């Protein structure tokens, strides 16, 4: 039988190459990957942060595809990971007598962040086409002196062409564990399922096709007053948009939700929040990445 699904994997190991960028430590990496993953050229900012775009060469996922993405940050590393295009999930493959409703495409993400390291994982949006079935799982292990920023933006269907998600389903599970010398603590757990029912429900998405999450887990000893100032600045961003946004304060960090009709508006909101997080963390101001949609760059 000819295999029609992808089984791809990508392993990235980042580490500090001390004082290789003038007087600034530079983060470099080693990698191992198979199709459909492809790594584009990495760059560095003035703080030595490694900026790496990842490309999915197959153009999208269909039922039965299975991907594994593993990221390790060694001590004293700074990394910005992103993707060069939106992730598209199609519903045309995977339907059979055994699975009449289709088969899920799946992605497993394993992330480990060691001492004094900081990972920003900001992929472009995931688009669930009609009848697309997609499940993603994240397991993140982070030290007490490190931070993790993650954005997850989902569009259900192509509303511009009148297409809905129909029988499609999006599932996501995020687990973040904090490591210390004695035991591991649960830092954050989030589980989401989006479907036609939740899309139409008044208590759900209420026919808004774009749903986004921004999660920032900071260092264990991060200043509470700085987090309060951050929340105040983010609320000012909320006042400048007509979209539905909410913010929650975690034990160590924040959680932001977006609900609206425009992916571009969601990206803009998250970029503005990212700038605030960089500022309160004492890092340089982020720049719009060249692999992101060109039309957005005019608004930032």
Swiss-Prot record:
List the subcellular locations: Cytoplasm
Pfam families, A to Z? UreD
* TM segment ranges: none
Subunit composition?
UreD, UreF and UreG form a complex that acts as a GTP-hydrolysis-dependent molecular chaperone, activating the urease apoprotein by helping to assemble the nickel containing metallocenter of UreC. The UreE protein probably delivers the nickel.
Q: Which GO terms describe its cellular component?
A: cytoplasm
Which keywords, in A-to-Z order, does the entry hold?
Chaperone, Cytoplasm, Nickel insertion
Q: In Gene Ontology terms, what is one molecular function of this protein?
A: nickel cation binding
**Protein name listed in UniProt:** Urease accessory protein UreD
User: What is the species listed in this Swiss-Prot or TrEMBL entry?
Assistant: Prochlorococcus marinus (strain MIT 9301)
Record flagged with keyword Methyltransferase: no
């Amino acid at each position: 039988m000819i295999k029609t699904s992808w089984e791809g994997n990508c392993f990235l190991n980042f580490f500090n190459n001390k004082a290789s960028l003038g007087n600034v430590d530079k983060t470099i990496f080693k990698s191992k990957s198979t199709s459909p993953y492809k790594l584009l050229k990495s760059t560095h900012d003035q703080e030595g942060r490694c900026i790496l775009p990842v490309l999915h060469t197959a153009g999208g996922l269909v039922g039965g595809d299975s991907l594994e993405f593993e990221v390790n940050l060694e001590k004293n590393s700074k990394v910005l990971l992103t993707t060069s295009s939106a992730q598209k999930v199609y519903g045309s493959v995977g339907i059979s007598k055994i699975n009449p409703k289709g088969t899920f495409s799946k992605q497993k993400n394993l992330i480990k962040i060691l001492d004094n390291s900081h990972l920003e994982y900001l992929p472009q949006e995931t688009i669930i086409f009609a009848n697309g079935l997609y499940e993603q799982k994240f397991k993140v292990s982070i030290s007490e002196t490190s931070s993790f920023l993650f954005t997850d933006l989902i569009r259900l269907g192509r509303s511009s062409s009148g297409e809905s998600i129909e029988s499609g389903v999006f599932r996501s599970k995020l687990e973040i564990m904090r490591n210390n010398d004695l035991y591991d603590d649960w830092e954050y757990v989030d589980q989401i399922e989006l479907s036609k029912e939740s899309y139409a429900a008044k208590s759900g998405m209420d026919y808004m096709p774009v749903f986004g999450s921004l999660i920032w887990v900071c260092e264990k000893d991060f200043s509470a007053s700085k987090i309060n100032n951050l929340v105040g600045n983010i609320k000012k961003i909320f006042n400048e948009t007509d979209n539905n946004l909410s913010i929650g304060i975690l034990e160590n960090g924040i959680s932001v939700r977006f609900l609206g009709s425009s992916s571009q508006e969601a990206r803009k909101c998250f970029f503005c929040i990212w700038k605030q997080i960089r500022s309160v963390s004492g890092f340089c101001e982020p720049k719009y990445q060249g692999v992101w949609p060109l039309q957005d760059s005019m608004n930032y």
